[in-house]
Amino acid sequence: MTKIKVLIGVALVAALVALGVGQANLQEPVVAATNDVMAPHFLVDPLWPKPLPNHWIQGNTIGVDVDERDHIFAVHRNTESQFMRIQEIGLYAGVAECCTPAPPILEFDLEGNLINAWGGPVEGAPYIWPESNHGIEVAPNGDVWIGGNGGPDSHVLVFSRDGEYIRTVGMPGEEMDSNSTTAYGRVAEIAIDASANEVYFADGYVNKRVAVVDLATGAFKRYWGAYGNRPDDDADVTYTPGEPGPQQFRGPVHCAEPSNDGLVYVCDRGADRVQIFRPDGTYVSEHIYNPATLAQGSTWDIAFSPDEDQEFIYLADGQNFKISIIDRESMEVLYTFGDGGRQPGLFFAPHSIATDSQGNIYTTETYEGKRIQKFLYQGMQPVTVRDRAPTWPADEL
């Protein structure tokens, strides 16, 4: 188990002793002997990650993944437009000692040490860096896949874990069309099904579909829209809470995550829903979360608990500033944690979410959030509060 950093206050240290939970506890039943509902619980680690070197700071942090070594990869937007030039990046602007944007790809270990940092546009490079980084996924062999949701971003890039360019998937700058087999439409998130040698694109901010490509080559394989329909970019996708959702994805199509048991979970963010499919696009079911949420929607990204059965889903809700703990069998919310705020354990637009092999959760925040947070797995506990804010030790609230 990873050593836990010394936290402020004796009570807080004592509360973290419970972190000595093992992987076996991840597979405890959902219902305790007392018939209390049981679910994974978490405490925020306020000292993770460690400060970045070189006066680096993060911009909008819009992707996170954990690789086979339990290294955490985050992608953020480090372009000048993401910051207040004089106030935030005075070193970059040449007017102050601090600060300057960090490279867009950041790799951390479990303790929060920065292991590597790379990426960004390079003059004369054989690739076109996304105008707006969006989403990151690390393959079992260490290859890093990166999406983009900027104006011309109709492609996905693949690099080695050290930032060496491998390939471009799709045609950069091509006209976007949800029925195209050669280009994509501002891909939001990327997920890998290594058992099938396939990669799923949540495609995306312009396109309204799930697209699947070959893991080894990037070759296009198949795609589908909401309910398994053929995508129609001209369809009415109006969403009205309490009424049936549109027959096409409203978008952005913000996640497409394959599970271990042969299902694919798709976030249709603007319609507050998660739709479940077979890998061939056959529709299975739909589940609505916080259906009164308008504006940017409630279903931003999901991660599975790391047990083999993936008993739980963790849903990032960037409009309501919280994380939902969902029983995957019933797709019911067991409880939520978080709220709006700047302190550890609170959120400003939680955008992406991932888990490591120990059961810990990692979240990123976009807009003015501009950070990544770690939530330490505390084992299975009875659900006594349905809405927790924030995830601090009880005696510190």
Predicted regions and their residues:
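Acidic, glycine/polar-enriched metal-coordinating patches/loops
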Residues: 1
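Eukaryotic scaffold repeat domains enriched in small/polar residues
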Residues: 4-397
